[in-house]
């Protein structure tokens, strides 16, 4: 059996991305200044020179998702024509939401409004209270989930209708590249996909893990993630489904506590409702804003960066979503994804983001000055939580929620990569 499994391992696809990443890490460590210069130029090229194409792709993929949902293709079942979904709507939505966002959503829900509040573009638009809560909803809602859902139904169709079990991007590209999917071109596509997957995973760890570590050290002084991760791996999709449901209960429990006992409930609801309205009212303008005069570089620094970020995560999350969507129609997958994915994301940013923003607007504390002074977002989030009643309880729930998010999302990635 081991010999059979070893023959199935594509060592080139498996090892090459790791070798490339280790080599790049060595170069970055040995030549930090030169590497920083090169990376800055690469970032400028993709964010500024060709950034418009990211915006165009974002709008296009949203339109495609809507078309697939409302057209005749929406009735196509991802599986046999009369097949029923394998998971309940709640279980399916929980897995999709947690695998698609990881623990980043908690970090950004608490802190992203502060970064916008210090951006010159906000001053061009109006007040911090009006706009700092709008952009998180825009950058984390419809277009990001459109990236996931369009590819998810494509991969689901490939896996469950065409019965093609090779979960590789080269296989997904076969209708376009034909027999070259089995050749050098297919290998190159798979190498790029796996490299992007590893890079995206590293980015996610680098963003939210310091917050997780800071909370754990403050509360316990130990790391407790290994047992949770091992449980999910050993129990496969059932383990992932259980962790996803647990994560959702913790997640919405956290939001409910902050909303009801944090003391900013009225502001959270009113400003959240207003921010959602502003986002929908200005959605087309926000989606196509390029800042051609480069007065603020806001779309280059934020919107284009985020669209690139979601594209990288589209290497893994859509395969997993497509896999668990067996038995659902294309319409159910897309619209259900928007309802559960976008809905949960918006609620998170509205509640957690507007809690801190409410304290800032009411001048009960000055988080913006703190961020400007030291740039420490992790310390800022801890300070935000410390202003809440039962702060230690909320810290415990937050850390458990982050662990569950990480375990679910990276287990799903492990299954996809395997």
Language-model features: where?
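Membrane-water interface regions at transmembrane-helix termini and the short interhelical loops
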Residues: 2-7, 34-46, 65-86, 133-139, ...
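C-terminal membrane-solvent junction of multi-pass transporters and transport-like membrane proteins
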Residues: 7-16, 75-94, 265, 270-273, ...
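C-terminal transmembrane helix pair
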Residues: 343-350, 396-416
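Membrane-interface segments at the starts/ends of alpha-helical transmembrane spans
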Residues: 4-7, 39-54, 127-143, 219-221, ...
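Membrane-embedded translocation segments of transport machinery
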Residues: 181-185, 193-328, 335, 340-395
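Helix-loop-helix module between adjacent transmembrane segments
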Residues: 5-8, 12, 19-29, 62-65, ...
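Flexible loop linkers connecting adjacent transmembrane helices
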Residues: 2-4, 38-43, 70-89, 114-135, ...
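N-terminal alpha-helical transmembrane segments of multi-pass membrane transport
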Residues: 1-129, 146
